[in-house]
């Protein structure tokens, strides 16, 4: 992700399913992203659900080799190694499982001419991970890609394709994360939202609260991505988040339904 995005949050009601030996299966939440640092768009939700006992994972499609927004390290293998460590730091700050890194080329997910097999391989690889994890809920970018980044849009499309196809292990409860106009301005004060990038407010029928502790975990997670954001930018963005969100963040279901405050119901 080239721009840090807004956090999304929820409360949790456990719904236990019996399994062998009298044990219960914990709920599983998977967030699917293009880049390490995209997870900052839902940082508080990941922290909260992990704290409440949900098995929380993030899947990152690209190697991040082209993301050098806040570092002198050249693009390529060196920056990719740093971003792996940043993703691990972020996951630890949020209290979730270590990141699942698929390693596809950063900035090139939609480059069909360079590699006609890439999109198919990405779809198959992501489906394999989801079949292994069997999440109850998925979170990913909306069709706008949050910041409009092409890799974000590709990930949204692949996840939506798997849901619509009823792929094994892929749930029907899928929520889109987006960035409000205020968020785009906070990330880059000189930039306004591109035309038609911000979804209509009426689509955000999932509105979920988050605690100060969840927000602080998300701030620490964001601060892990030092190749992407300066300390000053982290503070500016988190202040804007706090002012704009006011303790809850809206999400858009892939298929809009009744207004709710619980991803699992």
PLM regions with names:
Residues 9-13:
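Hydrophobic membrane-insertion alpha-helices, especially the h-region
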Residues 20-133, 161-168:
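Active-site rim/loop-helix segments in enzyme catalytic domains that contact anionic ligands
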Residues 2, 6, 16, 20-29, ...:
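Metal-dependent de-N-acetylase/amidase catalytic core
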Residues 7-8, 68, 109, 217:
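A broad, structure-centric signal for solvent-exposed, well-ordered loop/edge residues
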